[in-house]
């Protein structure tokens, strides 16, 4: 093992002058009202702490062989229904989620020593939801979605740049850029949500809430 990597660690002290933790201990009582209020609060805290791209999350899927695949995507909505992101449905992740409609996402906010993992079944959102978000995107992002056949091989960077130029010519500035027919939103409906909070000596706080027979259970896990 690389000795430099083996020696890398963080103490997760996050203590003030009085020796107490700057943030209060995570407790099961904080999830009595459900997973969403605390998740929104932690996301707001990450924003205020200046965490880069606080809505970035690692999305886990499995391919046709059962092999796990992960990548970073951006959360574009949180509601009682679940966690929302958008993608090309014909991309690797889109096809994998169509074949196995279950996913896991993890938000990791290192500067505040917090992490949330959400697992659950997925479904495509309505065309209306997709259209509303699509038209809120910058023009360049919409052109990029048309230019890229996501996850497909391409010969060179020059070919990719040429595809973007072609998309810009196809949709001039005065022309509305329509939603790609194979592009849209995917909603993860939470079945399990785990909140993790770093603490000294690796005695981290872990609280998991799970949907069981229509009701949410809450339990503390050992670190």
From Swiss-Prot:
Positions of FMN binding: 71-76, 86-87, 93, 115, 150-151, 196, 206
EC assignment: 1.4.3.5
Pathway the protein acts in: Cofactor metabolism; pyridoxal 5'-phosphate salvage; pyridoxal 5'-phosphate from pyridoxamine 5'-phosphate: step 1/1; Cofactor metabolism; pyridoxal 5'-phosphate salvage; pyridoxal 5'-phosphate from pyridoxine 5'-phosphate: step 1/1
Cofactor note (record): Binds 1 FMN per subunit.
Catalytic activity reported: pyridoxamine 5'-phosphate + O2 + H2O = pyridoxal 5'-phosphate + H2O2 + NH4(+); pyridoxine 5'-phosphate + O2 = pyridoxal 5'-phosphate + H2O2
Listed InterPro entries: Pyridox_Oxase, Pyridox_Oxase_CS, Pyridox_Oxase_N, Pyridoxamine_oxidase_dimer_C, Split_barrel_FMN-bd
Keyword Membrane among record annotations: no
Cofactors that this protein relies on: FMN
Gene Ontology annotations of biological process type: pyridoxine biosynthetic process
Record function comment: Catalyzes the oxidation of either pyridoxine 5'-phosphate (PNP) or pyridoxamine 5'-phosphate (PMP) into pyridoxal 5'-phosphate (PLP).
Assembly with partners or alone: Homodimer.
Family (UniProt): Belongs to the pyridoxamine 5'-phosphate oxidase family.
Protein name: Pyridoxine/pyridoxamine 5'-phosphate oxidase
The organism of origin for this protein: Rhodococcus jostii (strain RHA1)
Lineage: Bacteria, Bacillati, Actinomycetota, Actinomycetes, Mycobacteriales
């Amino acid at each position: 093992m690389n000795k430099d990597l083996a020696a890398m660690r963080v103490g997760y002290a996050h203590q003030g002058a009085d020796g107490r933790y700057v943030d209060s201990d995570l407790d099961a009582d904080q999830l009595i009202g459900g997973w969403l209020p605390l998740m929104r609060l932690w996301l707001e805290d990450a924003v205020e702490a200046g965490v880069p791209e606080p809505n970035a999350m690692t999305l886990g899927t499995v391919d046709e062989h059962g092999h796990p695949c992960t990548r970073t995507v951006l959360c574009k909505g949180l509601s009682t229904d679940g966690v929302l992101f958008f993608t090309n449905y014909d991309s690797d992740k889109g096809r994998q989620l169509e074949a196995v409609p279950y996913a896991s996402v993890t938000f990791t906010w290192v500067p505040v020593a917090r992490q949330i993992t959400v697992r659950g079944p997925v479904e495509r959102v309505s065309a209306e939801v997709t259209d509303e978000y699509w038209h809120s995107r910058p023009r360049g992002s919409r052109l990029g979605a048309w230019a890229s056949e996501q996850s497909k091989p391409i010969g060179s960077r020059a070919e990719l740049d040429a595809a973007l130029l072609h998309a810009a010519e196809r949709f001039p500035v005065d022309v509305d850029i329509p939603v790609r027919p194979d592009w849209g939103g995917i909603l993860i409906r939470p079945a399990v949500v785990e909140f993790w909070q770093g603490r000294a000596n690796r005695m981290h706080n872990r609280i998991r809430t799970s949907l069981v027979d229509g009701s949410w259970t809450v339990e503390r896990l050992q670190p």
